[in-house]
């Protein structure tokens, strides 16, 4: 009987231990859980997740990492990821600040100050990571081909510490942003309440006006239709009279413009004919004179040519 109880006890304890181990194995690490939140959160969290992934790759200190650490490739990548994270964070903070408008000025200033401090700590953490990698590159280059095993070990230790601090400050920033967002939501609800209070009297006035219109609608439909028809007929007659008057005015204006244009055209025609006659009187004497001079010149040339072509008398007899 004791052996049976002992066997049952051992089986029970083994089962409990298996359950505990299963729970421990299924529960994600804080860093992995935080990274999962970054991958499905706001845009600044996604950018921070990319920075975090790149830092994890750098921590492997593989041969490719060590080669790129000796150049400026790693620091350039980290700088780009840092700038992207801070840019998205600033944009998200500005968006929340716009939503905090209905909140009291004192509360908004306090939340903004706390959030700005948390944002500065996160930026300083990322800057420390980049600075440590720059320092490592300088130390390796100063070794001049010697063993850098100790330098790599120290770098790995520092990166682990920096990663923990970065995780802590990022978590703190997320919490403060959650408070900031809650304040913005509360301010928005207050703003909606204020709008409802302002719109309440207007809605009541609209309801009263609708009731008045409903009472008027109780009149006989034929009577109201007749009144509307008379008003419409009078309005159409008035518009027709105005249109006819306007057409008459337009016709008169068109006739007047046409007469002026014809008169101006006649004046231009007369001026052109007079100018043509004047030009003709100017140039005809000149042309005739040039013709006379040309005729005289031709005669002189012909006479000269005839004289030179006459036969010269011979002296041989």
Swiss-Prot record:
The entry's keywords: Chylomicron, Endosome, Extracellular matrix, Glycoprotein, HDL, Heparin-binding, Lipid transport, Lipid-binding, Oxidation, Phosphoprotein, Repeat, Secreted, Signal, Transport, VLDL
Cellular compartment(s): Secreted; Secreted, Extracellular space; Secreted, Extracellular space, Extracellular matrix; Extracellular vesicle
Start and end residues of each stretch annotated as LDL and other lipoprotein receptors binding: 158-168
List of residues binding heparin: 162-165, 229-236
UniProt name for this protein: Apolipoprotein E
Lineage, highest ranks first: Eukaryota, Metazoa, Chordata, Craniata, Vertebrata
Function of the molecule: APOE is an apolipoprotein, a protein associating with lipid particles, that mainly functions in lipoprotein-mediated lipid transport between organs via the plasma and interstitial fluids. APOE is a core component of plasma lipoproteins and is involved in their production, conversion and clearance. Apolipoproteins are amphipathic molecules that interact both with lipids of the lipoprotein particle core and the aqueous environment of the plasma.
Disulfide cysteine pairs (residue numbers): none
Signal peptide: 1-18
Region (Specificity for association with VLDL): 278-290
UniProt PTM: APOE exists as multiple glycosylated and sialylated glycoforms within cells and in plasma. The extent of glycosylation and sialylation are tissue and context specific. Glycated in plasma VLDL.
Recorded family membership: Belongs to the apolipoprotein A1/A4/E family.
Top-level taxon in the UniProt lineage: Eukaryota
Region Lipid-binding and lipoprotein association, residue ranges: 210-290
Molecular functions per Gene Ontology: amyloid-beta binding; cholesterol transfer activity; heparan sulfate proteoglycan binding; heparin binding; identical protein binding; low-density lipoprotein particle receptor binding; phosphatidylcholine-sterol O-acyltransferase activator activity; phospholipid binding
Gene this chain is encoded by: APOE
BP term (GO), one: high-density lipoprotein particle assembly
Protein species of origin: Pongo pygmaeus (Bornean orangutan)
């Amino acid at each position: 009987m004791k052996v049976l109880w002992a066997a049952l006890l051992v089986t029970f304890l083994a089962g409990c231990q298996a359950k505990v181990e299963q729970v421990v194995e299924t529960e994600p690490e804080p860093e992995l859980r935080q990274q999962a939140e970054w991958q499905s959160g706001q845009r600044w969290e996604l950018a921070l997740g990319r920075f975090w992934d790149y830092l994890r790759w750098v921590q492997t200190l593989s041969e490719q990492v060590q080669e790129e650490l000796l150049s400026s490739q790693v620091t350039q990548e980290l700088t780009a990821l840092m700038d992207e994270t801070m840019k998205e964070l600033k944009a998200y903070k500005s968006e929340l600040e716009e939503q905090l408008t209905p909140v009291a000025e004192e509360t908004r200033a306090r939340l903004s100050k706390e959030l700005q401090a948390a944002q500065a700590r996160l930026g300083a953490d990322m800057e420390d990571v980049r600075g440590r990698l720059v320092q490592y590159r300088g130390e390796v280059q100063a070794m001049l081909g010697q063993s850098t095993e100790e330098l790599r070990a120290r770098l790995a230790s520092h990166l682990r510490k920096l990663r923990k601090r970065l995780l802590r400050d990022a978590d703190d920033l997320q919490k403060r942003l959650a408070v900031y967002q809650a304040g913005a939501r509360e301010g928005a609800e207050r703003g909606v309440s204020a709008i409802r209070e302002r719109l309440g009297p207007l809605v009541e006035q609209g309801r009263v006006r609708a009731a008045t219109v409903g009472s008027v609608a109780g009149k006989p439909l034929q009577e109201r239709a007749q009144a509307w028809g008379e008003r419409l007929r009078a309005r159409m007659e008035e518009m027709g009279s105005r249109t006819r008057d306007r057409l008459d005015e337009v016709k008169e204006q068109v006739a007047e413009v046409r007469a002026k244009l014809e008169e101006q055209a006649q004046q231009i025609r007369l001026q052109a004919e007079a100018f043509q006659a004047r030009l003709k009187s100017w140039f005809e004497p000149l042309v005739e004179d040039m013709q006379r001079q040309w005729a005289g010149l031709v005669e002189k040339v012909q006479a000269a040519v005839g004289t030179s072509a006459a036969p010269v008398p011979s002296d041989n007899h």
